[in-house]
Design a protein with these regions (language model features):
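Hydrophobic secretory-pathway targeting helix
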Residues: 1-34, 153
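Juxtamembrane interface at the cytosolic side of transmembrane helices
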Residues: 4, 145-208
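Intrinsic disorder/low-complexity segments enriched in polar/charged and small flexible residues
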Residues: 11, 15, 51, 89-91, ...
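Membrane-proximal low-complexity regions enriched in glycine and acidic/polar residues
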Residues: 26-108
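A composition-biased, non-transmembrane "mature-region" signal
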Residues: 43, 48-58, 110, 131-134, ...
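Glycine-rich loops and low-complexity Gly/Arg-rich segments
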Residues: 92-94, 104-107, 142-146, 161-166
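Alpha-helix initiation/capping motif
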Residues: 97, 122-125, 151
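Extended, hydrophilic extramembrane loops/domains of integral membrane proteins
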Residues: 103-145
Length: 208
């Protein structure tokens, strides 16, 4: 039972950690190598793509999506999608996809004359499931070792979440101590008393 309890809570916290890792913004220092637009047919991985943008037909099973190709300082390639989030989840309220694509196109550079940018995004890159992180903004930085800045939004959100979890835990402990534990103790005492009575009755029967 103890093992099942640990497995349950580890699973819950793993899901929570994955949720925050996917949803919260992250910053990469990259060099933009190309930008393009591609028609995407959405399948089982559709949950990792944004809904159709404002003014688009939401009933279509495919649509054109902007992409931003980049290369990190260490040489590895990273491809980002560039989609509006609109009023949906996650709540980035992004409506400037076209402007961001134009900005990315203007910041393209070669390895001979690199121009590095800080690219803020959320989501994961997984080649097997064909999912891409979604770019939300970018700005020019001095070089590949430039600071990514302090993630104030992440700190505030995680602090508020931790405070909420702690508050719920404290109230649950108080409720358990005042309501559940006494009830369980009464049930256990009543069961023990009935068991003792039954044992006494059985002993008296055996003596006759």
């Amino acid at each position: 039972m103890a093992i099942l309890k640990w497995v349950f809570w580890l699973t819950i916290w793993a899901v929570v950690a994955a949720f925050f890792h996917y949803t919260l913004p992250q910053v990469d220092i990259v060099r933009v190598t190309d930008t393009y637009e591609k028609r995407i047919d959405f399948g089982n991985n559709s949950m990792f793509w944004s809904k159709a943008g404002v003014g688009n037909n939401t009933a279509l099973g495919n649509r054109d999506v902007f992409f931003i190709q980049t290369r990190r300082a260490k040489g590895d390639v990273m491809v980002y999608r560039n989609e509006d989030t609109g009023w949906g989840w996650p709540p980035y309220f992004k409506f400037d996809t076209t402007n961001l694509q134009a900005e990315a196109s203007d910041l393209k550079s070669s390895s001979g004359s690199p121009q590095y940018v800080a690219l803020k995004h959320y989501g994961w890159r997984n080649e097997f499931f064909s999912i891409f992180p979604n770019a939300t903004s970018m700005w020019v930085v001095d070089g590949p070792n430039a600071s990514k800045g302090i993630p104030f939004a992440n700190i505030i959100i995680l602090t508020l979440f931790a405070a909420m979890v702690y508050a719920i835990w404290v109230r649950w402990r108080r409720f358990k101590r005042s309501r559940i534990d006494p009830t369980v103790e009464r049930i256990e005492d009543d069961f023990a008393e009935r068991q003792n009575r039954f044992s006494s009755w059985m002993k008296s029967r055996s003596k006759k």
